[in-house]
């Protein structure tokens, strides 16, 4: 038997309705902030991610699904959404649109070769936003407010917004030099990943997950001590907007995020629900990227965005015991007696469905008792029984499956009955 590839999942009907509910809620909420949907290819040129995400990142070095197509071009299944959206912004010359910033959102599968663990898959679904074309602290604050709005709209609590400034390019350069000087004498004691990052991307050492290394990192210089005046002022304005909005936040000077393109504001939304056994899990993250467009041969525009995993959002809802308000039951189940009634039911179903009524019937020639059980299993709100007598008299009994009460109406008036 051929089985599903490791690190992937089948989303069966009982779960897919939860996905659809969440995606619909996200689509609706995001319109309040004037974001428009963009859809980019699932695969892109490998060079897009090598340049846009960063050659030295774990994503590019270890996690991408890369292959040669029949034209001998190097192609990669997208591991994240920002680079592709920025590529599209550049390619379609969106900087010429007077409606700046351009506010875009996306939703779709991403691919990373990661170790399988709870809430993480090698194919995962990511919802993200990008606001490109305005370097303004109020845009950063709006994006952070949107993050909180999304998760709170699903009833989640125990949320912690963690923020930091990684400064502009000049601040980052000075800070990276200080990190190299700090870590170089002891780097041989660190994990192999940290050793390889020392001269390629020293800030990523701060993101190391090895317990022994995390202890040593505590003595490292802090980015906040290397921010120039412009970066400091920008960060203070972002925090002032958050204060005005009444959004609590925690500052973490070691928060750098996993991708190379971040500048100024970086953030993560975390959750410390007691059901996680004291562990803190990251729900989503993002930040500002002021050099990414130029890095991809685009204009000197700036952007900010975030991405969240639908899988991790579902897991968080499950851990907090939150039931989604999903209404997908049938309006009507038609029970039939005899060939003539069964044939009529096919025509009736078509009429009902074209009038916005969710309806179904038996297809296995069950007896009446079996058909009623099927109606119950499907959660039908109402049932009707059609036989030769009902067809002759043009009368049917509409049974409320919740109360057990029935009402006799004309068969021709069934649509009007449900629309009243």
What are these regions (language model features)?
Residues 1-420:
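TRNA-recognition modules of translation machinery and tRNA-sensing kinases, especially anticodon-binding
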